[in-house]
């Protein structure tokens, strides 16, 4: 099975540093790839990370600020050079539609590109299906219209082999039972339990807002910006960003399994300060979220599936 993992291409905020490129986050998911917020220099980072450009199916932009989208032309050119690739869809808020279309035109790449605007609403808006999973977007609170993204796999079923055998359900009958819900007096619930689908959440520039928790609720893996430390909370609020403490608290409240901290201000020479702040916030709420401080070119696996609950005895 193809891996599900996040490739971190860049982690800087508004200004890159000697060791941190502008934004760029590539999610590998069941043989396809979704690229989030490619800032300037993403194409070069893809080479370092050995990312296959033709596998990119969608580019999802949270808002029109340059550090989140100026890498689009280079990525499209890389896809054309490394092809043959699949058609690519470029998603972003309605407010950014013309901006994104211009970036696609500037690329002048021989890649089939569709630009789709997303209504910015205070409720989930379905964007697309990715390998059977639902990709949705929801409004956040930044200085320009901004969305966060959520990729949610449908729940599946875990079958009890012994219960199937006892019920005489074998071979193609298992699939028939799953489709119909009942077969020869045997109910699906008698021989299986629901298995939660995996969830990925992506939240960039935003003030602390209830939508942050909703976007990453029960996420196996979530990327949250933490541009500032809590000691610069006033600056974070004024500029429309999260602090590390706010990111940690949101992840803990949402039940996130692994939190990837990213989008750091260049004012912090030692980013362990931000990681420690987020971990302390998780601990304060009694959360179990693992906090990962992102570095450029990190590869962070989506945690293994949650175990299905035990089937009740009949």
Curated annotation (Swiss-Prot):
Q: Which Pfam families match?
A: Lactamase_B_2
Gene for this chain = rnz
**Annotated cofactor note:** Binds 2 Zn(2+) ions.
Q: How does it assemble?
A: Homodimer.
Q: What is its EC number?
A: 3.1.26.11
Kindly give the PANTHER family that the UniProt entry links to this protein.
ZINC PHOSPHODIESTERASE ELAC PROTEIN 1 (PTHR46018:SF2)
Q: Which residues form the active site?
A: 67
Q: Name the catalysed reactions.
A: Endonucleolytic cleavage of RNA, removing extra 3' nucleotides from tRNA precursor, generating 3' termini of tRNAs. A 3'-hydroxy group is left at the tRNA terminus and a 5'-phosphoryl group is left at the trailer molecule
Q: Which cofactor does it need?
A: Zn(2+)
Q: Does the keyword Nuclease apply?
A: yes
Q: Is Translocase included in the keywords of this UniProt record? A: no
Which keywords accompany this UniProt record?
Answer: Endonuclease, Hydrolase, Metal-binding, Nuclease, tRNA processing, Zinc
Which residues does the record give as Zn(2+) 2 binding sites? Answer: 67-68, 205, 263
Residues binding Zn(2+) 1, per UniProt:
63, 65, 142, 205
Q: What does this protein do?
A: Zinc phosphodiesterase, which displays some tRNA 3'-processing endonuclease activity. Probably involved in tRNA maturation, by removing a 3'-trailer from precursor tRNA.
Molecular-function GO terms, alphabetical: 3'-tRNA processing endoribonuclease activity; zinc ion binding
Under what name is this protein listed? Ribonuclease Z
The family line of this record is: Belongs to the RNase Z family.
SUPFAM superfamilies, sorted: Metallo-hydrolase/oxidoreductase
Q: Which domain of life is it from?
A: Bacteria
């Amino acid at each position: 099975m193809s891996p599900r993992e996040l490739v971190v291409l860049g982690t800087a905020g508004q200004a890159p540093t000697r060791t941190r490129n502008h934004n760029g986050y590539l999610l590998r998911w069941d043989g396809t790839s979704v690229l989030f917020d490619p800032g300037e220099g993403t194409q070069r980072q893809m080479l370092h990370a050995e990312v296959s450009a033709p596998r990119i199916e969608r580019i999802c932009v949270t808002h029109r600020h340059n550090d989140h989208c100026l890498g689009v032309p280079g990525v499209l050119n890389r896809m054309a050079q490394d092809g043959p690739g699949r058609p690519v869809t470029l998603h972003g808020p309605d407010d950014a539609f013309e901006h994104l279309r211009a970036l696609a035109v500037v690329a002048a790449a021989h890649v089939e590109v569709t630009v789709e605007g997303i209504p910015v609403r205070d409720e989930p808006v379905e964007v697309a299906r990715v390998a059977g999973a639902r990709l949705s977007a929801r409004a956040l609170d930044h200085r320009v219209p901004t969305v966060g993204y959520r990729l949610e796999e449908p729940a599946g079923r875990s079958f009890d082999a012994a219960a199937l055998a006892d019920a005489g359900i074998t071979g193609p009958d298992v699939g028939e039972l799953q489709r119909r819900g009942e077969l020869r007096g045997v109910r699906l619930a008698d021989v299986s339990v629901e298995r939660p689908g995996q969830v990925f959440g992506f939240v960039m520039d935003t003030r602390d807002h209830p939508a942050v928790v909703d976007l990453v609720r029960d996420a196996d893996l979530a990327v949250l910006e933490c541009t500032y430390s809590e000691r610069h909370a006033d600056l974070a609020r004024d500029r429309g960003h999260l602090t590390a403490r706010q990111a940690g608290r949101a992840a803990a409240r949402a039940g996130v399994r692994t939190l990837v901290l990213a989008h750091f201000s260049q004012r912090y020479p030692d980013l362990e300060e931000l990681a420690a702040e987020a971990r302390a916030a998780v601990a304060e709420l009694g959360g179990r979220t693992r906090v990962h401080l992102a570095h450029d070119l990190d590869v962070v696996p989506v945690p293994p599936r949650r175990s299905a609950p035990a089937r009740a005895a009949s």
